[in-house]
């Protein structure tokens, strides 16, 4: 009992030690943080870290303060965030640290303003269900480069990224008067080591040690940590960094494993305490019960284990940022657009029953928890009229294709995301089984402008019957649904076709034309565009009035597959298979008065004249 009372005192101290940071670049440190004597020590006193993960890249910048206040009201004292390399290096050598959600300095300032410590997770590999695990896609095009290993070309690229990042965040470390108290080296590297046994363990360790050294060389002078499953410390732990556990429920295991790799002492932390789980298209929406979660949290509290809720607030994979997984039986498991994660704070920033259950417990340890902020206003948009259309085949008539004898990958075409239309003209008739086991994601096949069928790596459909008459055209519209972000195959995540298609086992080569459709910006239709043909991919465009902007959810349940832009912002992918059937439209993306909407519908089995904005998300409706 005396031990438990001591733990409670420590936790209460931890939760009240943060009166708020005032950040001034290069300022003298106002607070101190270190790992000492088996403890996290803040201003000379042992504390427990009660953190929540939120990725600034997945939350509109206008809502950062609201979400951080939601975390503070939950009873947390820190926020953890990944930095996704490819979110900031938008093209080779082109860096963006200032626009929209990319302004990491503004996010760190917001965290400081709200009195939250920051735990920075810069990778360079992040995972996080993010496109390519955070790596820029073009790394895979460098012939001499091997990612995530002791390779000069790769480590040189990592150093450039880390130096760029450090220039933005160095002065936000607690040693400089800022809120960042810890930085992570690499991420879940032990998992990769276990998956890549073809690489010697000493080579793996040389690489991870090099990443740690690059962080130090760039000016990170705060405690460093790693995060891995407790059974993977042999490959994941880095000398000089605190090992933390991911998803470990057993208190004794946590202490035993950390002690073994940290000089026999703590502190002990679960760096990823899973509030929910990730979600894939064509699979059920994952949930973790509040009861199971809070019972485990209580065990950590009783044992003095620090933790980081992964996720406390997931946010949204706007645009083409979602990643993908795979299994031995499923070639691709693309992640849905929503990163709700069944987290305590919903995708739209709402307090869930899980939030209330957690808060009730944490308030026992901290009497100064502020009130829960009000929700962002929610509106409905009953009828958004779609007044213009253009089928994609008409649109590409004015484009210049890439011509090649083979079917290049997206990467070979110099294209990171979006779509590519592969076209070939046949002077002789051919009929039989079209085989496309080299398709990386999803494609729709057309003959002379008529839809024939679909190719789908998600469901394992890689062949179909075709009949191509004399003097006819075969088209295949291929989508990149997100590069693999986890596992040994991350180094092989190419898009498009990695092998040529065959018809009746004969490779179809020669005279291919590729139309590149990156969709990096919303397509704009000219006045008078009204082209439409059922079955062909179509672009819809419309305008709608908003009297008072607020959050809403576009109801895409009756649509097929595609993406939506509102006022030029790509809200992400929709797909009728589910489980996600709505797209979150933050009110901060809307404006009072006229607003523009563009929908690219790939399947186009049903013609639409409107779309609606409803007040509740649909995230768990699976249609197979």
Q: Where do the protein language model's features map onto the residues?
A:
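Aromatic-lined ligand-binding clefts that engage carbohydrates, nucleic acids, or primary amines
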Residues: 431-446, 474, 544-567, 574-575, ...
């Amino acid at each position: 009992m005396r031990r438990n009372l001591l733990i409670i005192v420590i936790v209460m101290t931890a939760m009240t030690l943060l009166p708020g940071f005032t950040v001034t670049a290069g300022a003298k440190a106002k607070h101190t943080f270190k790992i000492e004597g088996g403890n996290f020590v803040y201003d000379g006193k042992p504390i427990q870290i009660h953190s929540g993960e939120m990725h600034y890249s997945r939350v509109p910048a206008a809502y950062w303060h609201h979400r951080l206040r939601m975390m503070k009201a939950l009873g947390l004292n820190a926020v953890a965030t990944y930095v996704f390399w490819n979110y900031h290096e938008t093209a080779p050598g082109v860096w963006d640290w200032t626009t929209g959600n990319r302004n990491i300095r503004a996010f760190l300032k917001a965290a400081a303003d709200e009195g939250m410590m920051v735990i920075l997770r810069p990778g360079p590999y992040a995972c996080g269900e993010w496109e390519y695990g955070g790596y820029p896609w073009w790394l895979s095009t460098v012939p001499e480069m091997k990612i995530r290993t002791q390779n000069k070309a790769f480590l040189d690229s990592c150093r450039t990224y880390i130096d760029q990042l450090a220039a933005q965040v160095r002065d936000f470390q607690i040693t400089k008067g800022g809120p960042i108290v810890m930085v992570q080296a690499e991420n879940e590297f032990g998992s990769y080591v276990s998956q890549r046994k073809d690489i010697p363990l000493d080579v793996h360790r040389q690489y991870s040690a090099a990443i740690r050294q690059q962080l130090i060389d760039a000016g990170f002078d705060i405690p460093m940590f790693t995060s891995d499953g407790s059974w993977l410390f042999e490959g994941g732990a880095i000398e000089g960094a605190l090992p933390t556990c991911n998803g470990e429920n057993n208190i004794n295991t946590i202490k035993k494993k950390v002690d073994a790799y940290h000089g026999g002492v703590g502190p002990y932390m679960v760096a990823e305490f899973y509030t929910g789980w990730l979600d894939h298209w064509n699979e059920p929406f994952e949930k973790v019960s509040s009861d199971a979660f809070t019972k485990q949290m209580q065990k950590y509290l009783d044992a003095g284990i620090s933790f980081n809720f992964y996720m406390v607030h997931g946010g949204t994979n706007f645009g083409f940022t979602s990643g993908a997984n795979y299994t031995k039986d499923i070639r691709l498991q693309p992640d849905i657009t929503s990163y709700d994660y069944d987290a305590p704070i919903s995708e739209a920033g709402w307090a869930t029953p899980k939030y209330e259950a957690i808060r009730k417990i944490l308030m026992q340890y901290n009497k100064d928890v502020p009130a829960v902020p009000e929700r962002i206003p929610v509106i409905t948009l009953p009828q958004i009229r779609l007044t213009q259309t253009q089928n994609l085949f008409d649109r590409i008539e004015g484009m210049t294709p890439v011509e090649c004898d083979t079917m290049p990958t997206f990467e070979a075409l110099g294209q990171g995301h979006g779509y590519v239309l592969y076209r070939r003209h046949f002077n002789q008739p051919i009929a039989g089984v079209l085989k496309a086991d080299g398709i990386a994601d999803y494609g729709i096949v057309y003959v002379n402008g008529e839809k024939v069928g679909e190719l789908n790596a998600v469901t394992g459909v890689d062949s179909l019957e075709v009949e191509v008459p004399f003097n006819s055209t075969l088209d295949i519209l291929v989508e990149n649904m997100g590069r693999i972000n986890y596992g040994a195959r991350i180094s092989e995540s190419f898009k498009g076709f990695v092998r040529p298609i065959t018809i009746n086992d004969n490779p179809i080569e020669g005279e291919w034309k590729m139309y590149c459709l990156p969709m990096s910006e919303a397509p704009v239709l000219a006045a008078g565009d009204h082209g439409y043909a059922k079955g062909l991919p179509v672009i819809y465009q419309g305008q709608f009035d908003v009297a008072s902007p607020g959050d809403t959810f576009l109801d895409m349940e009756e649509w097929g597959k595609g993406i939506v832009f509102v006022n030029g912002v790509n809200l992400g992918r929709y797909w009728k298979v589910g489980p996600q059937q709505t797209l979150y439209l933050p009110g901060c993306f809307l404006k009072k008065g006229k607003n523009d909407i563009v929908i690219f519908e790939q399947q186009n089995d049903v013609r639409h004249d409107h779309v609606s904005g409803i007040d509740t998300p649909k995230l768990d409706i699976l249609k197979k």
